[in-house]
Amino acid sequence: GIYILLKEVIDNAVDEFIMGYGKRVEIAINYNTGEVSVRDFGRGIPLGKVVECVSQINTGGKFSDDVFQFSVGMNGVGTKAVNALSTDFEVRAYRDGDFSEAFFKRGALVSQKRGKSADSQRNGTFVRFTPDSEIFKKFQFREEHVLRRMRMYAYLNAGLTLDVNGNKIISENGLLDLIHDEAQFEKLYQPF
């Protein structure tokens, strides 16, 4: 279950890449505490919708027919589920020099704030969460499993850079890189 939480947040970042916004996703995982943060450099959640997009069903941007056809996530449910299943959940959206952020505890809104973002902040979304240990008993993210999943995202999205705790994962050739990296053959032949 903890990997599904991670997947749902990353899927939103990948959706931005697929639609032509942002080519980099920064992921930090504390393998001791289970805390995860994901920062994409896409368009950022609309500032007036930050709380709704992570806490109320049927309020995400993926309910637009134009967006839906490109979405890989749960179409408006994913981050809400992550929020509900986390002890702590933080979301911050950056858009055109402004930001909006919200903090939750076990799905309940604790605080929210809007303002001007630092000059260096590019558009995009930041999400930080810790899976609830009362729901996910004795959980622990396994680094090798996380890195393998991130490589799969890279293979399926050529040109996307995933930075996982400082490890850059990128595939320029997509599925060809997957075949090359995973093939057990002595020589990989090029197609005619």
Kindly give the residue locations of the regions a language model identified:
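N-terminal assembly/transducer modules of large multi-domain enzymes
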Residues: 14, 114-192
